[in-house]
Regions:
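Hydrophobic anchor at the beta1->P-loop junction of P-loop NTPases
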Residues: 293-295
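Glycine-rich phosphate-binding loop used to anchor ATP phosphates in small-molecule kinases
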Residues: 358-416, 466-480
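Auxiliary tRNA-acceptor-end handling modules of aminoacyl-tRNA synthetases
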Residues: 52-73, 85, 94-105, 109-275, ...
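Conserved nucleotide-sensing/catalytic segment adjacent to the nucleotide-binding pocket
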Residues: 331, 335-378
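Short beta-strand-centered segment that lines the nucleotide-binding/catalytic pocket of NTP-utilizing
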Residues: 317-334
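Conserved lysine of the Walker
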Residues: 303
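Hydrophobic positions on the alpha1 helix immediately C-terminal to the Walker A/P-loop
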Residues: 306, 310
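Conserved NTP phosphate-binding and transfer environment spanning the P-loop NTPase/kinase superfamily
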Residues: 288, 411-555
Length: 555
């Protein structure tokens, strides 16, 4: 019997395909050339993997490895192929555990436990096996199983962190991916075969290795590896502290919440952060010649609360801190430059009156009395309201702004008078041993919650603006992070369980017809891994209060 023919609109052209054909076959037969490979499709606005089959008339859009979602799928697929190749080379009996930790440069840092020796020769063999799997276009399968069956499967394969994670999942089904004999669970979509996995490298690093990956803008080139040792060691230290509390993965956190509650974890985390801030203040004071504390970090890092808490610690050490916001040195709005999209660019250095900033700061350093400006965000004008300042022996300026680590901002100030601090929310928790939590996700959820509370901004608006925020960070903050004298991790191991309560209603408010719905759906799925906790026990000086409300600081 002939199969029913269905209408499929691709790039404005209506085509006919038989019901049940795979999207892979449609892509291959379309004759449409794309700059980079098609890895997923959008079917009536919904993402679908290429092994899925056509069920009804639809509009079809191709998602390539150069698209954000497509590139994330590519990276996830490389990780799956890597894991299979490790077991191929070492033998399953010689590998107890392979763990993904955090991003390093353009790649991911992994460690491995077991009898297999981790050296460059081993990595070269793994790399060769990955290319073999890719050259053979080894299929990547997907099947849906009952949650109980998935838990048993994870136990059988000694994936105990996944086993613990799914004990707390409310879903009845779990998607399991496989490449040959190797089964695993991944949070997110996957390629339909290993043939995509062409561009990567493996390099020994610290106690493990780095899986090097391309950049999305050029997905066929591996950029040179530049170790970021300072931020790496901050992440490693945070992870080690989490491990000391027996909370490395989301399942561990959920287990702790259900058995003991969160109070002790909360108090220990807050104490660790306070000790870190105190150490930073002690170092600043002990160096003796610092007058300008330059604080920078990406969006929603908790810079404002951190500045307040550092100021308190500096005061406790006998100093007299004065906050200075670089935003007060914005040029008048009519003089703000435009970005490549024709929009006002408030995040570039050129939006700041750098000359006036240096003139004022140098005058303060020389003991002069200076009237400081205040930027009026309603009128878009810089104003002077009689705010005078003169620095004495114990006075010190705490300067917060995204360009704080860039010496072009403070070019006239002597290097020895500056102390640079980089702050970011470097998530120390992962979903499980093979599914990391990107630090950007934690910051985006923080921002969604804060902006809704303080600015009345919808989650839809925050998500829509996020790519622009990220571009500003890539250009103005991340290139200078290793210039910092010290780094501070503002992430709290329990925070996503708390933020969930505030973020979920905001994300559910995004309609399915909106372009931001896909990201909202992804974040909701992510938050569903966590058991929620109330915010009542969070101290009022906590960095997290900057986002959920109730801070004792003016944030």
């Amino acid at each position: 019997m002939d199969k029913k023919m269905l209408k499929v609109v691709i790039a404005g052209e209506t085509r006919m395909y038989p019901e049940g054909i795979t999207y892979r076959k449609i892509v291959d037969e379309s004759g449409i050339h794309t700059e980079t490979p098609v890895i997923l499709v959008m079917v009536n606005g919904k993402l679908r993997e290429l092994q899925k089959r056509l069920k009804s008339d639809c509009t079809l859009e191709f998602v390539t490895t150069k698209d954000h979602i497509g590139f994330e799928t590519y990276k996830r697929s490389v990780c799956l192929v890597l894991l299979r190749a490790i077991y191929d080379v070492a033998g399953r009996e010689n590998v107890d555990k392979v763990m993904i930790h955090y991003s390093v440069g353009n790649g991911y840092y992994f460690t491995m436990e077991g009898k297999a020796a981790l050296d460059q020769d081993f990595l070269d063999k793994v790399k060769a096996q990955m290319h073999k799997l890719a050259d053979e276009c080894t299929p990547i399968g997907k099947r849906s199983v009952n949650t109980d069956e998935a838990v048993a499967l994870f136990h059988k394969h000694r994936m105990y962190d996944k086993e613990k994670l799914f004990r707390f999942r409310r879903v009845s089904k779990v998607n399991i991916y496989n490449i040959g004999y190797y089964d695993d669970y991944f949070y997110g979509y996957m390629a339909d075969h290993a043939g995509y996995v062409q561009y990567f490298d493996l390099k020994l690093y610290d106690e493990g290795f780095v899986l090097e990956l391309p950049e999305r803008k050029n997905p066929s080139v591996i950029p040179p590896f530049h170790p970021q040792d300072k931020i790496f060691h901050v992440q490693k230290e945070s992870q080690e502290w989490a491990e000391k509390m027996d909370i490395s993965y989301v399942g561990d956190l959920n287990d702790r919440i259900t058995k003991e509650g969160i109070s002790n974890v909360l108090l220990v985390q807050e104490a660790l952060q306070e000790a870190k801030i105190s150490d930073i203040a002690q170092r600043i004071v002990s160096e003796g010649n610092k007058k300008f504390i330059m604080i920078a970090g990406p969006s929603s890092s908790g810079k404002t609360s951190f500045s307040h808490r550092l100021s308190i610690q500096l005061t406790a050490h006998g100093m007299k801190p004065h906050p200075i916001g670089v935003d007060n040195y914005f040029k008048n709005r009519e003089d703000t430059p435009f970005d490549e999209f024709g929009e006002k660019n408030y995040e570039c250095l050129e939006a700041i009156d750098v000359e006036q900033f240096n003139k004022d700061m140098l005058a303060l350093l020389n003991g002069e009395c200076v009237e400081l400006p205040v930027f009026n965000f309603k009128t878009g004008l810089r104003e002077y309201k009689g705010d005078f300042l003169k620095l004495g022996k114990d006075d010190i300026l705490v300067i917060e702004g995204i360009h704080g680590l860039n010496d072009k901002l403070s070019y006239a100030l002597p290097a020895e008078s500056k102390f640079k601090i980089y702050i970011s929310a470097l998530t120390q928790l992962n979903i499980d041993e093979h599914n990391r939590i990107p630090t950007t996700d934690g910051r985006l959820i923080r921002r969604i919650v804060r902006d809704a509370r303080t600015r009345g901004t919808s989650a839809k608006e925050t998500i829509a603006r996020w790519p622009s925020v990220r571009r500003g960070e890539e250009a103005n903050i991340f290139p200078y992070q290793e210039e910092a004298d010290v780094m501070f991790n503002s992430a709290l191991v329990y925070e996503l369980a708390c933020l969930k309560v505030y973020a979920e209603p905001l994300l559910f408010g995004i309609d399915k017809s909106e372009p931001e719905y896909l990201e909202a759906k992804r974040l909701l799925k992510f938050l569903d891994y966590f058991i929620s906790v109330p915010s009542e026990d969070i101290p009022h000086n906590s960095l997290l209060r900057e986002f959920v409300g109730g801070s004792c600081f003016d944030v």
